[in-house]
Amino acid sequence: VVKQLVEYGRSLEEANHKKFRFTLTTNGVLLNDEIMEFCNHEMSNVVLSLDGRREINDKMRPFRNGSGSYDMIVPKFQKFAESRGQKNYYVRGTFTRNNLDFADDVIHYADLGFQQMSMEPVVADPSEDYAIKEEDIPAILKEYDRLALEYIKRKKEGRGFNFFHFMLDLKAGPCVAKRMAGCGSGTEYLAVTPWGDLYPCHQFVGNEKFLLGNVDTGIVNTDIRDEFKSCNVYAKPGCKDCFARFYC
């Protein structure tokens, strides 16, 4: 499916004076040399999904027989990152209530030889035992501070790494769209389901309230699109007068 979509996209580029940038996310299980070669040729960026240290990843991502996936996927990811010259990829982790010490996971990625990484908070039903609660926020903020100190320390030692959420250009800032809204959901970003349904973002898939349309009909629910357009820094009282509103 991926190969067919890329081929189809490439066939449209010249006639429409466009250049597609494709990105692939993989959990690594089916990753092999052929897929790596294809991605290195066609994918502008790849996301290597690894939930954290061995014990964290294997707790959240076991195989059906209960065994962990860490030992299978990490060597593949290391090989893949090297094949891309340690550029144009991210090792993406997820922190939950099980690993609020997620700085250790990012540091672990660096110790494995990865140079491009990201760590995102889990989105989960509040009833799940791993769901993040409001009471966890102070600990999470402290953890970002701890990670920042280690980040600076390693940069000074000549063994630095890139952490996606610390990459802020204070001189130029991000593009105008990101400065205004931060998120492109429903305006410059769409999620397409295997059935062709269009949603503002993958987080909304399955929530019929946010169904925008279909690949056959195009966007028909323009009210939702307009609602997302109005979500910007000037519409948020806590943001509109903040000095960091265009960098946050």
Predicted regions and their residues:
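Radical SAM/AdoMet-radical enzyme domain recognition
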Residues: 2-122
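Flexible, active-site-proximal loop/turn residues at the rims of small-molecule/cofactor binding pockets
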Residues: 52, 123, 244, 248
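Residues at the C-termini of beta-strands that transition into short coil/loop
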Residues: 50, 121, 167, 202, ...
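Membrane-interface junctions of multi-pass transporters
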Residues: 180, 205-247
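Structured core elements
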Residues: 49, 90, 118, 182, ...
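Short, charged, surface-exposed secondary-structure boundary motifs
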Residues: 56-60, 127-128, 211
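A C-terminal junction/extension of Radical SAM enzymes
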Residues: 128-208, 247
